Regions:
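Terminal helix/beta-alpha structural elements that buttress the NAD(P)+-binding lobe
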Residues: 1-15, 22-57, 62-336
């Protein structure tokens, strides 16, 4: 829907503080097909999560990068003609990417894009918990609630919250209980249970921080009810209503605000998003520490599609149809 593969797109031209990346693998997100189908202006390149090798280095980026370095990160796919990840080449600001160690595959590296960046913004910037710095923080007397912990975003939220020293409470389907515990959850509850709020509040009555990694239907209300005794903030990944409780606020967060530019969806009538300097600073800090912190923030499970653009299109169709579970879809470019 809404897009096509083009083979006559020029290689992006970089500025002095950018690097040119030859893409080796990408990861797929629901935001990709939403941009393709509805949001993106004509001529923009879709795709956010990438891994690859540095092909060219801007004059001001030479102290950090050299040609041939392995690199990964996230870009604002679906807004620009030369920055989307679903391309053979993309350009990115040199401090908004991370160096991939030799023991991490391209497909695993590609998963540290939108899902991981969103988790960093929510856990470290908005909720103010300690950033990763190569070692786990000392335990703190604080518990955080993460709704939908088995999602790609949820698994990164769990890991970053644990790395910050928190006790992590989450929800999932029973078949995913072991998965979320493997990634660090201290307690997990069946989100389908009609008494899930009562069960959580009984065991953890004093939470004030929540993140809704589903953000549809009743999920945000569940988060609010879990923290309403003490009051606090629920962070959502999509707009999902307004809080019914005066001591609970909702905060919509999107990974794109970490990329340092204002943007608007469906102009002139769509919502505008202003520059958030603290978000960009957070991403620089996160990606700088990530290569030394991969024993703490581990890659999430992946499902590999066929290589190349056909694999991307088929994967987006699966996401569009709600046919993906158990891992993040990834696609390789070129040889395995």
């Amino acid at each position: 829907m809404g897009g096509r593969v083009q083979d006559n797109v020029p290689v992006p031209t970089i500025t002095s503080n950018e690097i040119l990346v030859k893409v080796k693998a990408v990861a797929l997100n629901p935001t990709d097909f939403k941009h393709l189908d509805v949001i993106s202006p004509p001529g923009s390149t879709i795709g956010c999560d990438y891994a690859g090798v540095v092909d060219k280095v801007g004059d001001a980026a030479g102290a950090t990068w050299k040609v041939g370095d392995r690199v990964a990160g996230a870009v604002h796919g679906g807004l620009f003609p030369d920055k989307g990840a679903f391309a053979e080449y993309l350009k990115v600001e040199s401090d908004l990417a991370w160096k991939v160690p030799d023991n991490v595959s391209d497909t695993d590296a590609a998963t540290y894009g939108v899902s991981a960046v969103t988790a960093m913004l929510n856990v470290n910037v908005r909720h103010g918990l300690p950033f990763i710095d190569g070692k786990a923080a000392a335990p703190r007397n604080e518990t955080i609630f993460i709704y939908a912990g088995s999602t790609s975003a949820g698994l990164y939220h769990i890991q970053l919250a644990k790395a910050a020293g928190c006790t992590v409470v989450t929800t999932a389907s029973p078949h995913s209980f072991d998965l979320v515990k493997k990634y660090g959850a201290d307690a997990v509850y069946n989100y389908r249970s009609p008494t899930v709020v009562e069960e959580i509040v009984k065991d953890y009555p004093d939470m004030s921080k929540a993140v809704d990694c589903f953000s549809e239907g009743k999920s945000t209300t569940v988060c609010a009810e879990v923290i309403k005794k003490k009051g606090g903030k629920v962070i959502t990944l999509l707009p999902n209503g307004k809080s019914k409780f005066p001591n609970v606020t909702y905060d919509l967060v999107m990974a794109y605000t970490a990329l340092g530019h204002p943007f608007q969806w469906l102009p002139p009538i769509g919502p505008k998003f202003e520059v958030q300097p603290a978000d960009r600073e957070g991403l620089v800090r996160f990606y700088s520490a990530l290569p030394q912190s991969l024993h703490i923030v581990k890659p999430i499970p992946t499902i590999e599609e066929k290589a190349g653009f056909d694999g991307i299109l088929e994967g987006l169709d699966k996401l569009r149809g709600g046919k993906v579970s158990g891992g993040k879809l990834v696609v390789r470019f070129g040889e395995k």
